[in-house]
Amino acid sequence: MSSLLSKTRRLNKILQKTGTEPVAFQDICTLLSEVLECNAYIVSKRGKVLGYTFSPGFECEAMKKKVIEDKKFPEDYNLTLLESNETLANLYNQGRCVFAEIGDCKTKDKISTIIPIIGSRERLGTLILARFGKEFTDDDLVLVEYSATIVGMEMLRALQEDLADQTRKKAVVQLAIGTLSYSELEAVEHIFEELNGNEGLLVASKIADKVGITRSVIVNALRKFESAGVIESRSLGMKGTYIRVLNEKLLDELKKIK
Protein backbone atom coordinates (compact mmCIF):
# COMPACT_ATOMS: atom_id res chain seq x y z
CA MET A 1 0.00 0.00 0.00
CA SER A 2 2.95 2.30 0.63
CA SER A 3 3.87 2.02 -3.06
CA LEU A 4 0.35 3.08 -4.05
CA LEU A 5 0.53 5.97 -1.60
CA SER A 6 3.81 7.23 -3.03
CA LYS A 7 2.47 7.02 -6.59
CA THR A 8 -0.69 8.87 -5.58
CA ARG A 9 1.38 11.59 -3.94
CA ARG A 10 3.36 12.03 -7.14
CA LEU A 11 0.11 12.41 -9.03
CA ASN A 12 -1.12 14.96 -6.49
CA LYS A 13 2.01 17.05 -7.06
CA ILE A 14 0.86 17.60 -10.62
CA LEU A 15 -2.37 19.04 -9.26
CA GLN A 16 -0.52 21.25 -6.79
CA LYS A 17 1.65 23.00 -9.38
CA THR A 18 -0.71 25.94 -9.29
CA GLY A 19 -4.36 26.36 -8.46
CA THR A 20 -5.04 28.53 -11.49
CA GLU A 21 -3.38 26.63 -14.33
CA PRO A 22 -5.12 23.65 -15.91
CA VAL A 23 -3.53 20.25 -15.35
CA ALA A 24 -1.67 19.14 -18.48
CA PHE A 25 -2.97 15.83 -19.77
CA GLN A 26 0.51 15.14 -21.07
CA ASP A 27 1.92 15.35 -17.53
CA ILE A 28 -0.56 12.76 -16.28
CA CYS A 29 0.28 10.41 -19.16
CA THR A 30 4.00 10.81 -18.52
CA LEU A 31 3.62 10.03 -14.83
CA LEU A 32 1.37 7.00 -15.40
CA SER A 33 3.75 5.68 -18.04
CA GLU A 34 6.68 6.07 -15.68
CA VAL A 35 5.21 4.59 -12.50
CA LEU A 36 3.25 1.79 -14.19
CA GLU A 37 5.76 1.06 -16.97
CA CYS A 38 3.16 1.29 -19.71
CA ASN A 39 1.93 3.30 -22.66
CA ALA A 40 -0.64 5.88 -21.61
CA TYR A 41 -3.15 7.73 -23.80
CA ILE A 42 -5.86 10.27 -23.00
CA VAL A 43 -8.44 10.50 -25.77
CA SER A 44 -11.39 12.87 -26.11
CA LYS A 45 -14.94 11.71 -26.78
CA ARG A 46 -14.34 12.32 -30.48
CA GLY A 47 -11.13 10.30 -30.55
CA LYS A 48 -8.67 13.19 -30.46
CA VAL A 49 -5.42 12.35 -28.64
CA LEU A 50 -5.06 14.92 -25.84
CA GLY A 51 -1.98 13.39 -24.25
CA TYR A 52 0.22 10.33 -24.63
CA THR A 53 3.48 8.75 -23.50
CA PHE A 54 5.09 5.62 -24.88
CA SER A 55 7.06 3.34 -22.58
CA PRO A 56 10.81 3.09 -23.33
CA GLY A 57 11.57 0.75 -26.21
CA PHE A 58 8.00 0.68 -27.51
CA GLU A 59 7.97 -0.11 -31.23
CA CYS A 60 4.71 0.02 -33.15
CA GLU A 61 4.66 2.19 -36.25
CA ALA A 62 0.88 1.87 -36.65
CA MET A 63 0.21 3.24 -33.16
CA LYS A 64 2.83 5.95 -33.47
CA LYS A 65 1.32 7.13 -36.75
CA LYS A 66 -2.18 7.36 -35.26
CA VAL A 67 -0.98 9.13 -32.12
CA ILE A 68 1.89 11.34 -33.31
CA GLU A 69 0.94 12.15 -36.91
CA ASP A 70 -2.85 11.85 -37.03
CA LYS A 71 -3.32 12.85 -33.36
CA LYS A 72 -6.56 10.92 -33.52
CA PHE A 73 -7.73 7.32 -33.18
CA PRO A 74 -9.84 5.75 -35.96
CA GLU A 75 -13.57 6.30 -35.56
CA ASP A 76 -14.41 2.59 -35.32
CA TYR A 77 -11.87 2.05 -32.54
CA ASN A 78 -13.05 5.14 -30.67
CA LEU A 79 -16.66 3.93 -30.87
CA THR A 80 -15.52 0.64 -29.36
CA LEU A 81 -13.91 2.55 -26.49
CA LEU A 82 -17.09 4.54 -25.89
CA GLU A 83 -19.18 1.38 -25.60
CA SER A 84 -17.67 0.71 -22.20
CA ASN A 85 -18.98 2.72 -19.23
CA GLU A 86 -16.79 1.01 -16.66
CA THR A 87 -13.14 0.01 -16.39
CA LEU A 88 -12.10 -2.92 -18.56
CA ALA A 89 -8.92 -4.30 -17.02
CA ASN A 90 -6.25 -6.56 -18.48
CA LEU A 91 -7.54 -7.13 -21.98
CA TYR A 92 -5.23 -9.39 -24.00
CA ASN A 93 -4.74 -8.52 -27.66
CA GLN A 94 -4.68 -12.19 -28.72
CA GLY A 95 -2.37 -11.35 -31.60
CA ARG A 96 -4.71 -8.74 -33.12
CA CYS A 97 -4.08 -5.01 -33.52
CA VAL A 98 -6.64 -2.74 -31.87
CA PHE A 99 -6.98 -0.99 -35.24
CA ALA A 100 -9.11 -3.21 -37.46
CA GLU A 101 -7.44 -2.10 -40.70
CA ILE A 102 -4.01 -3.26 -39.48
CA GLY A 103 -4.97 -6.87 -38.74
CA ASP A 104 -2.35 -8.97 -36.94
CA CYS A 105 -0.18 -7.50 -34.19
CA LYS A 106 3.53 -8.34 -34.01
CA THR A 107 3.41 -8.55 -30.22
CA LYS A 108 1.40 -11.38 -28.69
CA ASP A 109 1.52 -10.38 -25.02
CA LYS A 110 0.04 -6.89 -25.08
CA ILE A 111 -2.32 -6.20 -22.16
CA SER A 112 -4.60 -3.15 -22.21
CA THR A 113 -6.79 -1.43 -19.65
CA ILE A 114 -9.55 0.97 -20.69
CA ILE A 115 -10.90 3.52 -18.21
CA PRO A 116 -13.88 5.76 -19.13
CA ILE A 117 -13.46 9.45 -18.34
CA ILE A 118 -16.75 10.78 -16.98
CA GLY A 119 -17.73 14.19 -15.66
CA SER A 120 -21.16 15.44 -14.60
CA ARG A 121 -22.57 12.05 -15.66
CA GLU A 122 -21.37 12.61 -19.22
CA ARG A 123 -18.78 10.60 -21.11
CA LEU A 124 -15.91 12.97 -21.89
CA GLY A 125 -13.21 10.62 -23.13
CA THR A 126 -11.10 7.57 -22.39
CA LEU A 127 -7.87 6.79 -20.56
CA ILE A 128 -6.03 3.87 -22.16
CA LEU A 129 -3.06 2.00 -20.72
CA ALA A 130 -1.09 -0.78 -22.38
CA ARG A 131 1.94 -2.83 -21.44
CA PHE A 132 3.46 -6.18 -22.27
CA GLY A 133 3.52 -9.44 -20.35
CA LYS A 134 2.42 -8.03 -16.99
CA GLU A 135 -1.16 -7.52 -15.83
CA PHE A 136 -2.31 -4.36 -14.05
CA THR A 137 -2.78 -4.97 -10.32
CA ASP A 138 -5.61 -3.70 -8.12
CA ASP A 139 -3.28 -0.97 -6.82
CA ASP A 140 -2.55 0.06 -10.41
CA LEU A 141 -6.27 0.26 -11.15
CA VAL A 142 -6.91 2.42 -8.07
CA LEU A 143 -4.30 4.87 -9.33
CA VAL A 144 -5.57 4.97 -12.92
CA GLU A 145 -9.22 5.37 -11.92
CA TYR A 146 -8.19 8.24 -9.65
CA SER A 147 -6.29 9.70 -12.62
CA ALA A 148 -9.36 9.35 -14.84
CA THR A 149 -11.40 11.29 -12.27
CA ILE A 150 -8.84 14.10 -12.30
CA VAL A 151 -8.81 14.18 -16.10
CA GLY A 152 -12.61 14.33 -16.14
CA MET A 153 -12.58 17.32 -13.79
CA GLU A 154 -10.02 19.08 -15.97
CA MET A 155 -12.02 18.38 -19.13
CA LEU A 156 -15.10 19.87 -17.49
CA ARG A 157 -13.14 22.92 -16.41
CA ALA A 158 -11.79 23.38 -19.93
CA LEU A 159 -15.31 23.14 -21.37
CA GLN A 160 -16.63 25.68 -18.86
CA GLU A 161 -13.76 28.07 -19.54
CA ASP A 162 -14.32 27.78 -23.28
CA LEU A 163 -18.04 28.46 -22.83
CA ALA A 164 -17.30 31.51 -20.67
CA ASP A 165 -14.78 32.76 -23.24
CA GLN A 166 -17.23 32.37 -26.11
CA THR A 167 -19.93 34.19 -24.12
CA ARG A 168 -17.53 37.05 -23.34
CA LYS A 169 -16.47 37.39 -26.99
CA LYS A 170 -20.09 37.48 -28.12
CA ALA A 171 -20.95 40.17 -25.55
CA VAL A 172 -17.99 42.33 -26.66
CA VAL A 173 -19.10 42.12 -30.29
CA GLN A 174 -22.69 43.00 -29.43
CA LEU A 175 -21.54 46.02 -27.44
CA ALA A 176 -19.31 47.16 -30.31
CA ILE A 177 -22.14 46.83 -32.83
CA GLY A 178 -24.42 48.73 -30.45
CA THR A 179 -22.15 51.80 -30.63
CA LEU A 180 -22.58 52.13 -34.40
CA SER A 181 -24.94 54.57 -36.05
CA TYR A 182 -27.27 53.27 -38.76
CA SER A 183 -24.96 54.44 -41.55
CA GLU A 184 -21.90 53.01 -39.78
CA LEU A 185 -23.63 49.66 -39.39
CA GLU A 186 -24.48 49.68 -43.09
CA ALA A 187 -20.85 50.48 -43.87
CA VAL A 188 -19.60 47.63 -41.67
CA GLU A 189 -21.87 45.12 -43.39
CA HIS A 190 -20.43 46.07 -46.78
CA ILE A 191 -16.86 46.10 -45.46
CA PHE A 192 -16.99 42.50 -44.35
CA GLU A 193 -18.84 41.42 -47.47
CA GLU A 194 -15.90 42.82 -49.43
CA LEU A 195 -13.36 41.07 -47.19
CA ASN A 196 -15.08 37.71 -47.67
CA GLY A 197 -13.13 36.20 -44.77
CA ASN A 198 -11.28 37.05 -41.58
CA GLU A 199 -8.75 39.38 -43.16
CA GLY A 200 -8.06 41.34 -46.29
CA LEU A 201 -7.48 44.67 -47.96
CA LEU A 202 -10.14 47.39 -47.90
CA VAL A 203 -10.28 50.44 -50.15
CA ALA A 204 -12.60 52.77 -48.25
CA SER A 205 -13.28 55.11 -51.17
CA LYS A 206 -14.56 52.26 -53.33
CA ILE A 207 -17.01 51.09 -50.66
CA ALA A 208 -18.09 54.68 -49.98
CA ASP A 209 -18.93 55.19 -53.66
CA LYS A 210 -20.63 51.82 -53.92
CA VAL A 211 -22.84 52.26 -50.85
CA GLY A 212 -23.37 55.99 -51.20
CA ILE A 213 -21.85 57.08 -47.89
CA THR A 214 -18.90 59.26 -46.95
CA ARG A 215 -15.45 57.83 -46.35
CA SER A 216 -15.49 59.26 -42.81
CA VAL A 217 -18.41 56.99 -41.88
CA ILE A 218 -16.31 53.95 -42.79
CA VAL A 219 -13.30 55.27 -40.88
CA ASN A 220 -15.40 55.95 -37.77
CA ALA A 221 -16.95 52.48 -37.87
CA LEU A 222 -13.54 50.83 -38.12
CA ARG A 223 -12.18 52.95 -35.26
CA LYS A 224 -15.04 51.87 -33.00
CA PHE A 225 -14.44 48.20 -33.81
CA GLU A 226 -10.71 48.58 -33.30
CA SER A 227 -11.24 50.32 -29.94
CA ALA A 228 -13.44 47.40 -28.88
CA GLY A 229 -10.66 44.98 -29.81
CA VAL A 230 -12.71 43.03 -32.35
CA ILE A 231 -10.52 43.97 -35.33
CA GLU A 232 -7.11 45.38 -36.06
CA SER A 233 -6.36 47.63 -39.01
CA ARG A 234 -3.24 48.98 -40.65
CA SER A 235 -3.02 51.69 -43.29
CA LEU A 236 -1.14 50.70 -46.45
CA GLY A 237 -1.29 54.17 -47.97
CA MET A 238 -2.70 54.34 -51.48
CA LYS A 239 -3.29 50.58 -51.50
CA GLY A 240 -5.96 50.87 -48.82
CA THR A 241 -6.35 49.52 -45.28
CA TYR A 242 -5.48 46.02 -44.16
CA ILE A 243 -8.12 44.60 -41.77
CA ARG A 244 -7.97 41.45 -39.66
CA VAL A 245 -10.78 40.10 -37.49
CA LEU A 246 -9.60 39.37 -33.92
CA ASN A 247 -12.92 38.19 -32.49
CA GLU A 248 -14.39 35.27 -34.44
CA LYS A 249 -17.88 36.08 -33.15
CA LEU A 250 -17.96 39.30 -35.17
CA LEU A 251 -18.87 37.75 -38.51
CA ASP A 252 -21.52 35.53 -36.92
CA GLU A 253 -23.20 38.50 -35.23
CA LEU A 254 -23.13 40.58 -38.42
CA LYS A 255 -24.84 37.74 -40.29
CA LYS A 256 -27.63 37.74 -37.70
CA ILE A 257 -28.28 41.44 -38.29
CA LYS A 258 -28.87 40.81 -41.97
Swiss-Prot record:
InterPro entries: CodY, GAF-like_dom_sf, GTP_trans_reg_CodY_C, Transc_reg_CodY_N, WH-like_DNA-bd_sf, WH_DNA-bd_sf
Subcellular location: Cytoplasm
Pfam families listed in its UniProt record: CodY, HTH_CodY
Organism: Clostridium botulinum (strain Eklund 17B / Type B)
Keyword DNA damage listed: no
Molecular function, one GO term: DNA-binding transcription factor activity
GO terms (BP aspect): negative regulation of DNA-templated transcription
Name listed for the protein in its UniProt record: Global transcriptional regulator CodY
Region annotation (GAF domain) ranges: 1-156
